[in-house]
Structure formats: structure tokens, C-alpha cells
Swiss-Prot record:
EC number(s) on file: 2.3.1.180
Its biological purpose: Catalyzes the condensation reaction of fatty acid synthesis by the addition to an acyl acceptor of two carbons from malonyl-ACP. Catalyzes the first condensation reaction which initiates fatty acid synthesis and may therefore play a role in governing the total rate of fatty acid production. Possesses both acetoacetyl-ACP synthase and acetyl transacylase activities. Its substrate specificity determines the biosynthesis of branched-chain and/or straight-chain of fatty acids.
Description of its domains: The last Arg residue of the ACP-binding site is essential for the weak association between ACP/AcpP and FabH.
A Pfam short name: ACP_syn_III
Cell compartments where the protein resides: Cytoplasm
Annotated organism of origin: Campylobacter fetus subsp. fetus (strain 82-40)
Lineage: superkingdom: Bacteria
Cellular component per GO, a single term: cytoplasm
Primary localisation category: cytoplasm
Protein name in UniProt: Beta-ketoacyl-[acyl-carrier-protein] synthase III
Gene3D superfamilies registered for this protein in UniProt: 3.40.47.10
This protein's pathway: Lipid metabolism; fatty acid biosynthesis
CDD domains for this protein: KAS_III
């Protein structure tokens, strides 16, 4: 049976930076308050770009590093909660078109911050079944477009960006296991209420700020830590791997406090953990591939590295992945 492997990663980080000191001038907050509660110091904003632009630029990097012809890509899948358009066309279709790919499978998924883990599970299935040979997966978000910049509880948390990977078949350094799950009963704790069918876009929903992201932070924090820790234990035990065997633990970059809490529960060292939330904030589905790209560029992510990915997001959704990196 063919095995699926991540053979390359890429990312795109917008140039414009919003610091905590900038936010001090916008809302009732302070650098000290933000850092103490989130660990975040800066985030990047895509002022003159849309989600498909970010995704396209991350995809170009992943394709170049993979050393494959773009025409060998036979599927483009994008995870995003900030698509260019509400219904259609999909962001993936736009990215494929921008790449000059006009006869490929292309579609979006919506799994919030767990999006990249969901993408991995889909790409793994497509490659290992023989349905596809080279799958381009992208997590891309322009969260600045759905943030209420007058709400200090959310506007300090999020940033824009994109991360991409190529998943292909390989005899070694493959994706060992992927687990995804959800619990829709708690979806109201992290939600963008407006602009869907329940609250269609109109003057009333805009006046009530329903088109912005709403989050019950304390409740989400507790559920996230407990769920993430259990999910990691489950996938490690299932595959007879201990935390000491892991070369890099790359969690979703939601909040430094969440990352630290999970790290301590599972006995990961600082050297094992990849942390980028300090510089980029929470970029939802883009955070894991962006963090993988950072680790690759600084030499920590190497061919054959045993990697553990873990994420929790709106829905609620969550998931984890265990893999050996196949990139060069």
C-alpha cells in the first residue's frame, strides 16, 4: 500500500505588522496585559490582499521546495474560515486558477483552527487510495476581516497568513496517523453568528456586529487544554510512541498559555516545542503549516523528523497527526 508523505512546506506572512503598542492606541489594553494573557507581541495583517492571495503565495513556495512541476498537482484543497466569497467560487478554485491549473480537483473545507489536520487526513486518504498523486493543501486566513477591532478580548489574538504543504506518495518518512473529531453542541462558544443563513447579511446583523467573531474565552481555554492533552495521549499510545520520542511538537498557535499548559501536562521540553504565536498571533488553519515552515527555515524540521501536530478550534473541532517529515 502506498504511504502519504509531506514532501514540502511553504508559508506567506503579510508584511504589515500590528504590535501590542499599536493596539494600545485602538482599545483599552496594554502590552503587559496582552503578553500576560496570550504571549502574543505582534501579528501580521494583509491590508491589500485577500485570502486566495495569501494561499497562492504560500503554495508557490511549497511547490518550489517540493521540486515538482505544478502541472503534476492533481488536487488543491484549502482550509479557511475567511474565504474570498461566502458561497462560491471556493478559495481553492481561485488558487488553482492563479497557479494555472484548470483541470484539477479543488475545494475548501471549514474546520477553523483544526483545518490543517483535517486537510492532512483528506490528503492522506487521497494519496494512499491511489486517487491522487500530488495534493496541495493550504491553510489560509484573513482573520482581520472578521475581527471587531473595538473588542479587546478578540482583536488582540488574531493575525493573517497562510501555510501550505505538498502531500505525495513515499516509501518512508510518511504520515503515520491522523485523528480528527468534533463536538457541535458547544459551537456557540466560538462563533461568527452573522452572514450565514441563520443571520443573513443585512443592516440589522451588521449593526449588532454579528458578522464578527465572538468567543467565550475562559470556557474555550479550559475545554481546549483538556481536549488537546487527551488527544495527544491517545495518538501517542495508539502508535506506541512516547513524548520523549518526538522531535518536534507543533501545536496550533492559539495562545501561549494553552501551549504551555499542554506542554507541561505531556512533559514536552522547550526544545521539542515550536512556538510562533508570539510573532504571528492566532492564524487559525494557517498556524500549523506556518509554524512548520518556521521550523523548516531555522533547521529544526528535517527530513525524517518525528513530528506531532495537534489542534483545537471552533465547531468544536480537534485533531492530531503523527508523521515523519519527508522534505529535503
Amino acid at each position: 500500500m502506498k504511504k502519504a508523505s509531506i514532501i514540502s512546506v511553504g508559508a506567506y506572512i503579510p508584511k504589515d505588522i500590528l504590535t501590542n503598542f499599536d493596539l494600545e492606541k485602538m482599545v483599552d489594553t496594554s502590552d503587559e496585559w496582552i503578553v500576560k494573557r496570550t504571549g502574543i507581541k505582534t501579528r501580521h495583517l494583509a491590508k491589500n490582499e485577500v485570502t486566495s492571495d495569501l494561499a497562492y503565495k504560500a503554495a508557490l513556495m511549497a511547490i518550489q521546495r517540493a521540486g515538482i512541476d505544478k502541472n503534476d498537482i492533481d488536487a488543491v484543497i484549502c482550509a479557511t474560515i475567511t474565504p474570498d466569497y461566502f458561497c462560491m467560487p471556493s478559495t481553492a478554485c481561485k488558487v488553482a486558477s492563479n497557479l494555472g491549473l484548470f483541470d484539477v480537483t479543488a475545494f475548501d473545507i471549514s474546520a477553523a483552527c483544526t483545518g490543517f489536520i483535517y486537510l492532512l487526513e483528506i490528503a492522506k486518504s487521497l494519496v494512499e487510495s491511489g486517487a491522487k498523486k500530488n495534493v496541495l493543501i493550504i491553510g489560509a486566513e484573513k482573520l482581520s476581516s472578521i475581527i471587531n477591532w473595538q473588542d479587546r478580548s478578540t482583536c488582540v489574538l488574531f493575525g493573517d497568513g497562510a501555510g501550505a504543504a505538498i502531500v505525495s506518495s513515499s516509501d518512508d518518512n510518511y504520515i503515520i496517523d491522523v485523528h480528527t473529531s468534533s463536538d457541535g453542541s458547544k459551537g456557540n462558544l466560538l462563533i461568527t453568528p452573522g452572514c450565514g443563513i441563520v443571520h443573513p447579511a443585512n443592516k440589522d446583523t451588521i449593526d449588532k456586529k454579528l458578522n464578527f467573531l465572538h468567543m467565550s474565552g475562559n470556557e474555550v481555554f479550559k475545554i481546549a487544554v483538556n481536549t488537546l492533552a487527551k488527544d495527544v495521549v491517545d495518538i501517542l499510545e495508539k502508535n506506541s510512541v512516547s513524548s520523549k520520542d518526538i522531535d518536534l511538537f507543533i501545536p496550533h498557535q492559539a495562545n501561549l498559555r494553552i501551549i504551555e499548559a499542554v506542554k507541561q501536562r505531556l512533559d514536552f521540553t522547550d526544545e521539542q516545542c515550536v512556538v510562533t504565536v508570539v510573532d504571528y498571533g492566532n492564524t487559525s488553519s494557517a498556524s500549523i503549516p506556518m509554524a512548520m515552515n518556521d521550523a523548516y527555515e531555522d533547521g529544526r524540521l528535517k527530513q525524517g523528523s518525528l513530528i506531532l501536530l495537534d489542534a483545537f478550534g471552533g465547531g468544536f473541532t480537534w485533531g492530531s497527526a503523527l508523521l515523519r517529515f519527508g522534505g529535503k
